[in-house]
């Protein structure tokens, strides 16, 4: 016989019962995202999904992403209900720029100590993002790892798979001199530049919960969920000849627009075509951030830029604005052998 205390997994910091409670809590919201192609439900070792029958030569498109240090701001302000939307948006917006329809999404949620309420809020946000983009939340991993994260801090990552007809892949190869650039307005900084945002808050001594901007707390502007453009863009692609789409994420204008430009072309952006949302003016002023750095770090009010032939512009703008987007002509494509792929003037 021994008088040693019997240890359990819970004694080591892993609460399986909490994990099971979380699964029970989220089943309903996850079920709402289900597409007809998905087979089975939550709890299997793997998720099964058939390809939609309308595709003749389907090509799968995949992407994975996180939300960067926007997550730190959300944790500090104890606002967990929209960070899941951000996570989905960062993945599905990357897929749709290639013409792909998102099919299914998986998430990874890791924490030192699982708080069921917090995790449920995050995953409910993920389900909402999936509803907005028309994809199914088919599974995920909730990892409780004591000693790896401080307290109830957590991290999230997402993985998405979509499908596009092989002949309809959008890769920028059709972009040519004279194409027009259309902008889609952003909902705020989206999920990029938050290390600089947090540094500006620190240096300025500003409390985002008590500082007001345009009649609401600065925190509301900074934590506004990333806009999901999937449904609007998919309809646009069906009805308009789209040559390229750039998702303005990390690297801003300078790095993301060139990713979809063929050689010997240059994007010329008309800075007078829009006004920065007030949150970007605040960030620039409070942080004394140079203009070039603003365009490299933030989207400055532009979430996506679409290149298309000039005759298609009016139709595209009408369709996008009818679908609730804030869309406008932001520039043109010029033939150029300059090393400067993007000009903002």
From Swiss-Prot:
Domain of life: Bacteria
Gene3D superfamilies, A to Z: PurM-like C-terminal domain, PurM-like, N-terminal domain
Involved pathway(s): Purine metabolism; IMP biosynthesis via de novo pathway; 5-amino-1-(5-phospho-D-ribosyl)imidazole from N(2)-formyl-N(1)-(5-phospho-D-ribosyl)glycinamide: step 2/2
EC number of this enzyme: 6.3.3.1
GO terms for cellular component: cytosol
Gene Ontology molecular functions: ATP binding; phosphoribosylamine-glycine ligase activity; phosphoribosylformylglycinamidine cyclo-ligase activity
Keyword match ATP-binding: yes
Compartment annotation: Cytoplasm
Biological processes, Gene Ontology terms: 'de novo' IMP biosynthetic process; adenine biosynthetic process
SUPFAM superfamilies documented for this protein: PurM C-terminal domain-like (SSF56042), PurM N-terminal domain-like (SSF55326)
Record keywords, A-Z: ATP-binding, Cytoplasm, Ligase, Nucleotide-binding, Purine biosynthesis
Family classification: Belongs to the AIR synthase family.
Subunit structure and binding partners: Homodimer.
Protein name: Phosphoribosylformylglycinamidine cyclo-ligase
Gene: purM
